């Protein structure tokens, strides 16, 4: 059963909350990745990659976002992007890039530790100031408040578009990425993969 649209506060307010949560320097919030198995009365159930099913209450101001398939052509100067990267041979190399809709510019801006895998990785949400082509790769110069990064985007990197989502996208069977609030009691945001898409972050 899909949740009523009335369960969601305005997307604008939810986006602000999501940004504040993700912008915390220590990034203490837990993440849950898995497949949506139920959504009813403000609570969702998710089967994790480990096969466990967890029940998660949504915060009243929870944000709802959708990722859809994209490609390297979307990575352009002036775009605001999120990138999960790893240190490889003395440089940062992207595993995935999510290109934000312009309405989400500035969301969770910064460069901070991430948890895509057990080995150290970082999330960088920043503006692309320059794009260079180096062989088949692209090298991005990125600027954010308080710093800058240079990250290589190989052709193997997953690229998705990231936008706000209506409640009807919260459908059973969809892959989801969930950001819990600081005390772990409720979901602050849910990133939903479009049909056939897994949130890569």
PLM regions: where:
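Short, flexible, surface-exposed loop segments at domain boundaries
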Residues: 2-5, 17-61, 65-201
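Sec-dependent signal peptide hydrophobic core
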Residues: 11-16
């Amino acid at each position: 059963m899909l949740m009523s649209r009335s369960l969601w506060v305005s997307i604008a307010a939810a986006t602000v909350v999501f940004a504040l949560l993700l912008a915390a320097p220590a990034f203490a919030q837990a993440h849950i990745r898995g497949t949506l198995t139920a959504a009813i009365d403000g609570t969702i159930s998710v089967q994790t990659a480990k096969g466990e099913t967890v029940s998660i209450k949504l915060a009243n101001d929870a944000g709802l976002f959708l990722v859809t398939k994209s490609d390297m052509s979307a990575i352009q100067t002036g775009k605001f992007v999120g990138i999960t990267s790893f240190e490889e041979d003395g440089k940062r190399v992207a595993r995935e890039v999510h290109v934000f809709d312009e309405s989400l510019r500035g969301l969770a801006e910064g460069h901070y530790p991430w948890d895509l895998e057990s080995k150290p990785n970082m999330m960088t949400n920043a503006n692309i100031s320059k794009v260079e082509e180096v062989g088949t790769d692209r090298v991005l110069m990125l600027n954010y408040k308080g710093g800058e990064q240079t990250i290589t985007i190989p052709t193997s990197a997953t690229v998705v578009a990231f936008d706000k989502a209506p409640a009807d996208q919260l459908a059973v069977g969809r892959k989801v990425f969930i950001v819990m609030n600081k005390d772990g009691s409720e979901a602050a945001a849910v990133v939903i993969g479009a049909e056939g898409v897994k949130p890569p972050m």
